[in-house]
């Protein structure tokens, strides 16, 4: 049988029609242009390119040319038109449709970030919509005061005049002191947490062979931890030790940054989209883009998927508290209080919204975080520095988690359906879905 005829049959089967094949090839060329534009923006914004593992000559080209921001914007506008002209036809595979929508929205966010680099100032909600495809709900102080009252009643009171005058955040800090991981035990606790997160993830998700990450301990950062994805299924995870690290952060960070969070998310995208399909746009991660809400939302929700509350408490009591030299009998009490404090997570969004809109200054933003988020003063000041650097990115953690949780639950991934919950979660991790595509209409 003629080899050329066989090859033609294979190509026809893959493309279905000549037009479909041409469209796919054209989208690949457009995706390459997108990657190069992201790398070009990175020459003007050091935080913009969060990860890149495509051809190194493209990075070198971006560094050598250092294109003007106005040129980048003009090319991005043209690329958007080219992408719009190549919308997939009716009946196209869902992933192909998602790819087209993803590339469109990522380019729109790139243009918004470029406009900001050129001096455009957006209000908080305008910025989050432009960059992350969503707007966070607004809350008032009254929304948090009821929870603060519950926390006030839950925290112990000590005798003495000074104790009676202590503020709620001071009492919360005092309560938490016994749950700090001693610095000399930090590494062993994190390794134990990582092992637990990884083993639970591997029970449900087949990871690419050779995947791994290393942990580094750093200081003088505005964030508490960071995953630097290197490509080839490898990550570097940095943990900031500027401030005391509490025992609950071990699982939170191990899951969020590692398994089944950022490390798994990036590895699955690399395997299923970049390598298996050749979609080069997934070789680069633009931080200020809709992809980040998916990344942060799945990373935060992944903690609950890997460790539902009863299982987490058992693991803490049996493994992590002893590894940290803490009293396991106090674990349940600690997590009861944390469950209340978690209801204050949107207080951070309000501080950021008011601060970035120019309604309050940095000191007032830290005051708000102390009063309504129960941040210690050093941690509140660190968070304001994070707002200075990353701005409306803060919504991706809490709103992102809630949106991912609702999306997974709407597809039957409820806590009582653990195996299916993992399946829905893995599908989300492996697909180019947009934040607006997560919205559940009741």
Report each predicted region and the residues it spans.
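N-terminal maturation segment of proteins
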Residues: 22-442
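N-terminal secretory signal peptides that target proteins for export/translocation
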Residues: 1-4
């Amino acid at each position: 049988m003629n080899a050329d005829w066989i090859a033609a049959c294979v190509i026809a089967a893959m493309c279905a029609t000549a037009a479909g094949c041409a469209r796919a090839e054209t989208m690949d060329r457009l995706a390459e242009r997108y990657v190069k534009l992201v790398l070009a923006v990175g020459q003007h914004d050091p935080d913009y390119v969060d990860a890149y593992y495509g051809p190194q000559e493209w990075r070198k080209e971006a560094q050598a040319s250092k294109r003007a921001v106005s040129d980048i914007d003009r090319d991005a506008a043209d690329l958007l038109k080219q992408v719009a002209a190549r919308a997939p036809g009716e009946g196209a595979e869902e992933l192909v449709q998602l790819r087209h929508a993803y590339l469109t929205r990522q380019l729109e966010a790139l243009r918004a970030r470029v406009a900001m680099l050129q001096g455009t100032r957006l209000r908080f909600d305008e910025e989050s919509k432009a960059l992350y495809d969503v707007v966070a709900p607004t809350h008032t102080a009254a929304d948090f005061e009821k929870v603060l009252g519950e926390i006030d009643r839950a925290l112990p009171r000590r005798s003495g005049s000074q104790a009676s005058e202590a503020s709620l955040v001071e009492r919360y800090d005092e309560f938490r002191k016994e749950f700090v991981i001693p610095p000399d035990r930090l590494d062993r606790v994190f390794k134990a947490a990582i092992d637990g997160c990884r083993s639970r993830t591997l029970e449900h998700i087949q990871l690419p062979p050779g995947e791994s990450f290393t942990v580094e301990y750093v200081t003088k950062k505005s964030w508490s931890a960071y995953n630097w994805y290197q490509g080839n299924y490898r990550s570097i995870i940095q943990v900031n030790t500027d401030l005391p690290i509490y025992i609950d952060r071990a699982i939170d960070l191990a899951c969020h940054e590692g398994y089944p969070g950022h490390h798994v998310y990036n590895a699955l995208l690399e395997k299923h989209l970049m390598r298996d399909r050749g979609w080069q746009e997934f070789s680069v991660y633009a931080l200020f883009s809709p992809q980040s809400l998916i990344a942060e939302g799945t990373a935060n929700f992944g903690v609950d998927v890997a460790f539902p509350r009863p299982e987490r408490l058992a693991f803490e009591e049996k493994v992590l508290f002893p590894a940290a030299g803490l009293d396991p009998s106090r674990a349940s009490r600690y997590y009861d209080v944390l469950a209340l404090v978690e209801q204050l997570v949107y207080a951070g969004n309000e501080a950021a919204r008011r601060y970035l809109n120019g309604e309050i200054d940095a000191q007032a933003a830290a005051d708000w975080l102390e009063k309504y988020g129960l941040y210690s003063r050093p941690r509140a000041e660190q968070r304001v520095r994070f707002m200075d650097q990353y701005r409306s990115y803060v919504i991706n953690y809490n709103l992102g988690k809630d949106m991912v949780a609702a999306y997974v639950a709407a597809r039957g991934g409820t806590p009582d359906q653990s195996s299916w919950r993992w399946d829905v979660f893995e599908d989300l991790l492996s697909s180019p879905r947009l934040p607006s595509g997560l919205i559940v209409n009741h």
